Amino acid sequence: MRTFESEHYRFHYGAGTAAERDITEIAAMQESCFRHICAVLGTTPDFRIEYFLCDSPEEVGHIYGDDDPCNGFADIPDKIYAVYNDAVQCVGFHEDAHVVSYTLNRPESAAIREGLAMYFDRKWWSIENLDWTGFYLKTGRYIPVDRLLDDDFFFSRHCAVAYPIAGAFTDWLISAYGIEAYRAMYRQKSVPQAMAQVYGKSPAELNAAFEAYVRLFRTDGAVEARMEALLRQHEVEA
């Protein structure tokens, strides 16, 4: 594979691929994402991230070594594997947020870890996390955050439902209580205990306050129609 180095990354990609064609733009985007994540979280890794840009999900699995097709994932502590071709570009904030945030801690709850990554992503299928969450509340698809804190339950739900909710909840936590409180919670292993200690509320109480906040907003009917169509297209069941 060919390589390209920027300040905080070493990119690996195949010759003649879309990644090779776009590598300077990819590097510039990832450096911008990296700087923003570090600024928000108040931490900067002391290593260069090894970023493998693959032409297909199958190539991700082959290069990683388990031959399990995947669009993208972070191999902690310092590696990211992502599909990049003309149809799919799995670059941006998400996996980089995992790599940077894990220099602080790796909380036990996947909903918290993925919620932070989705906080930086802001959108799922180009629609805001908050819009998805409000739509799920309106249509009876919403899953309470206190239930999502259980990993088995979280991973049993479709990511198109669980991830935007977790991202919107993280956004609300940070905007309502501040980044320092969030960092204090994130640094602990047990999330329910950390929530009680840092926020003075149980996960269920925080979820109730979050739901009340989400209900303050309305989503345009055309956006709701687009969300419904996307869920049908991807055969999503809450």
Give short role names for the model-derived ranges.
Residues 60, 65-73, 80-87, 103-237:
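Acidic/His/Gly-enriched intrinsically disordered linker/tail segments
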Residues 1-2, 236-238:
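Short, solvent-exposed mixed-charge patches
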Residues 1-109, 191-198:
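Juxtacatalytic substrate-recognition/specificity segment
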